[in-house]
Amino acid sequence: MLDSVASTLQLSELLSLTKAEQSIRLAEINVELEMLSAQERVAWALQNLEGAHAVSSSFGIQAAVMLHLLSKQQADIPVILTDTGYLFPETYQFIDELTKSLNLNLKVYRANESANWQEARYGKLWEQGIEGIEKYNKLNKVEPMRRALNELNVKTWFSGLRREQSQSRAGLPILSIQNGVFKFLPVVDWSNKDVHYYLKEHGLSYHPLWEQGYLSVGDTHTTQKWEPGMSEEETRFFGLKRECGLHEEDNEQDGSGI
């Protein structure tokens, strides 16, 4: 089946096409990728998508799935974490545990200004409505990730986004181009049940806060515990938005934007 999917893709060649031409080319490949297992998709991507590869992780509730899936096929793949300085203590502990147990090649990136310095300059941005949250995300998520991809010369970026996580992710393809790099989502069609079975099969753990009722975990000040009647996306950013900015197109063409 893998042989039926297109051979090595040259990023520069695809970027020379119009958006419409890119969409047609990628759509043909995605039809084939949808028929493969997550493990087969990863194997195909590592073999056929040119350039350096990396996986981003927030070390959230189900993070162990992608980290295990990728590191088992490429042990030294860089794992990019953008550390805001406001993660839960349990998240930092989870990072240490997974880094040790999976022998991860962890690469930590942070904002140019420390958390305290940002508060001194801008106040608590997360309390300043959607504009404040977007500025906070740009400083602490988008710019550090942009820097990581540039410094590591990443051409293929793996992520664990899944369609059922939110309405904004419902139509995501497995393979796309985002701001000049390949974006590859091998578990995009997985359900929560699929995730659970994978974790159980491989002896992996959920984030520690899962047991306390958290469905999604980010920063302490913009993460809420799930309550009856809430959707998963309503547990983040006060329900104002789902994405932190990392997975949104910013229309840059040089591959630096996230």
Swiss-Prot record:
Cellular compartments per GO CC: cytoplasm
Gene Ontology molecular-function annotations: phosphoadenylyl-sulfate reductase (thioredoxin) activity
Class of the enzyme per the UniProt entry, highest EC level: oxidoreductase
Pathway(s) this gene product operates in, as recorded in its UniProt entry: Sulfur metabolism; hydrogen sulfide biosynthesis; sulfite from sulfate: step 3/3
Active site: 244 (nucleophile)
Reaction(s) catalysed (UniProt annotation): [thioredoxin]-disulfide + sulfite + adenosine 3',5'-bisphosphate + 2 H(+) = [thioredoxin]-dithiol + 3'-phosphoadenylyl sulfate
EC numbers, comma separated: 1.8.4.8
Designated name of the protein: Phosphoadenosine 5'-phosphosulfate reductase
